[in-house]
């Protein structure tokens, strides 16, 4: 797919998301996530919160270039069908498994270790249990982006406090739109709990 055609699909997805009250990942955060997937050579990516598929399309493109696979999880089957349609139009459906499931339940059944993850769930209370369930499935130096940490700071306070207290995570916060936490999993770091 040409970069122009891909951009047209991404623009259409963003418009669809805003019309339907489900703002997607900020474009700059999506581009950074795509770049991180490519530069780390991620093979197994996980998206918790498919939404309408905007970030899914970015991640799927990186997985296609890396020869990897993406699992994208959402409880909303209607939104996943929108994502499926756009992924098919982009020719990327073959690198994505869409799962209509609870985030924690889906994480607990993963077969492959995770190199890269995006947490962008509508249910902010599910961020921390999802991340905790993900820990034993993360490869060393796995990268995780969690969206909405500034716009939903109060709802995600326990999530962020837990990360800050966990010495096996390196954390930086990004300023794009609603804010993102960018984490790197360092399991051999001293002071683990």
Regions found by a protein language model. Name each.
Residues 1-116, 123-145, 149-193:
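A short alpha-helical cap/connector motif
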